[in-house]
From Swiss-Prot:
It comes from the Bacteria. It comes from Lactiplantibacillus plantarum (strain ATCC BAA-793 / NCIMB 8826 / WCFS1) (Lactobacillus plantarum). GO terms for molecular function: rRNA binding; structural constituent of ribosome. One of its GO terms (biological process) is translation. Belongs to the universal ribosomal protein uS8 family. One of the primary rRNA binding proteins, it binds directly to 16S rRNA central domain where it helps coordinate assembly of the platform of the 30S subunit. Part of the 30S ribosomal subunit. Contacts proteins S5 and S12. The keyword rRNA-binding applies. NCBIfam families: PRK00136.1 (NF001109). Signal peptide: none annotated. The keyword Lyase does not apply. This is Small ribosomal subunit protein uS8. The lineage of its organism: Bacteria, Bacillati, Bacillota, Bacilli, Lactobacillales. GO terms for cellular component: ribonucleoprotein complex; ribosome. InterPro entries: Ribosomal_uS8, Ribosomal_uS8_CS, Ribosomal_uS8_sf.
Length: 131
């Protein structure tokens, strides 16, 4: 049994990115779909598609690379873990690399970026940093 599916998802992205794979597939869940959509909207991945397989589904993530095949994602870090949850108040939402990266935060209004959380004045659980 997997104890932290979000960490597994981020690790699969990190590993595929390191060996410059074009895409990767992960078992789907609602929170993974939300995280993948955030990565797409923020320009870290090229595309995300959901494949219905009459079970839990599969998320296919298409990785993005710059010219000369340079990585767009230079780092991914899981912050709030099952053994040590990390919560922030609305006035303490972190900035990643002075705004060059993003923090993915699970709030009462869903999974959003640190910029959206600051704009909506929401706190929540800091899931991961991406830069």
């Amino acid at each position: 049994m997997m104890t932290d599916p979000i960490a597994d998802f981020l690790t699969r992205i990190r590993n595929a990115n390191m060996v410059r794979h074009d895409s990767l597939e992960v078992p789907a869940s609602k929170i993974k779909r939300n995280i993948a959509e955030i990565l797409k909207n923020e320009g870290f991945v090229r595309d995300v598609e959901y494949i219905d397989d009459d079970k839990q589904g599969i998320i296919r993530v298409f990785l993005k690379y710059g010219k000369d095949n340079e990585r767009v994602i230079s780092g991914l870090k899981r912050i709030s873990k099952p053994g040590l949850r990390s919560y922030v108040k609305a006035d303490a939402v972190p900035k990643v690399l002075n705004g060059l990266g993003i923090a993915i935060i699970s709030t009462s209004e869903g999974v959003i970026t640190d910029k959206e959380a600051r704009a909506k004045k929401l706190g929540g659980e800091v899931l991961a940093y991406v830069w």
